[in-house]
Every structure is written in C-alpha cells, then in structure tokens.
Amino acid sequence: MATGTDKDMAMQAVADKEAAEAAEVAVVTVPLKALADIPVEPLAGKIVLDTNNYYFERDGHIDALDRGEATTSGLLQAHLPTSKVAKAFNNIVWRQITTDGSPAGTPDRRALGTASDHPEASAFTAKLYDELGFDTVDLGPLSESWRLERDRPGYGTRQTREQMLANTAAANRLP
C-alpha cells in the first residue's frame, strides 16, 4: 500500500497497517487472494483506490468473478464496508501513469476509467486523473466496474474518452 495526499501527491511504500492508519487516501494493489489481509478499521471512512485486476492464473479461480456475479472492486468494498472504494488506475500500465498524461484539452488525451458507490471517491479520482493528465470515464456504481476489467474492450489499451465510453458501453459481462 502507498499513502499520499491530493495536495502534494507524495507517496511512499510502508507496511499495510501503518499505511492504512496514516493515509488520507489509500491505494490497494494486491493479488485478490490477499484481500482478506487488508486492514479494515484503519481504512474506515477513507477513500480507497482499487487498482486490482483479476487474473485467475495468479489469484486462483474466484467463482463469483468467473460467473460475472461480482466485480473485483465490489469484493474489496465488501471487505472494507465503511471505506469509500473507487476503481482506479486498473486500465493503465503503472509506467504510463507518469508518461502518458497531457494537458486538459489536448486532442486524443488518454482516458482512465473509474467507478464507485461514493460520489466523493469518484470526484477525488477524477481530480487526480486530471492532475496527472488524463480524462475520466465515470461508469457510476461499483456494480458497473466490470466494464473496466480484464478481457473487456475498456481494459489495458490507450483510449480517448470517446473511445472508452463507446467500448465500455459495448462490453459484455462475461468475456
């Protein structure tokens, strides 16, 4: 886990519990099989950005995901019931976060997707994306975050806002 604020965007890697206690906003990037290890109480009331993607090759098969009955971010929200989970940064390779951004209004500006059941988490994510040079595609509630997951057309490729809107709208629940 990493900690940081939207004021200075400073981040540092620390132990899970320490990060959770110190964070104003937390970023969760763990294999899904490790969700149960994420501390719950220290993250209560905080925005938690979920960058996770389901890879059954790494995570083992998770029936609810395989059947399209759950989303990765929904599983995290269920584990952190008093946190404000937002799907974020899952459809970009980490190296590109610092290289693919461009000023607002730039033609063909890259878009990143988000979804959350908490408007303040969605707003935070959109602001962060913009500060880093990306447009936002807000898919609404976490129940729609599957549209950004692996093997869907909104996942993993560089897309403009218009392209991502079209691709996520056309996505099938089961790949």
For each of these PLM feature ranges, what is it?
Residues 1-25, 29-34, 41-42:
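Conserved N-terminal Rossmann-fold NAD(P) cofactor-binding segment
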Residues 5-9, 66-67, 102-106, 154-157:
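Short, hinge-like loop/turn segments at secondary-structure boundaries
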Residues 13, 84-88, 137-141:
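General beta-strand structural signal in soluble alpha/beta enzymes
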Residues 21-24, 32-41, 54-70:
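Rossmann-like adenosine-cofactor binding region
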Residues 29-30, 51, 88, 115:
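Short, well-ordered coil/turn residues at beta-beta hairpins
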Residues 31-34, 92, 118-120:
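Short beta->alpha connector loops
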Residues 47, 52-103:
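Rossmann-fold NAD(P)-binding glycine/threonine-rich loop
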Residues 107-175:
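Active-site-lining helix/loop region of Rossmann-like oxidoreductase modules
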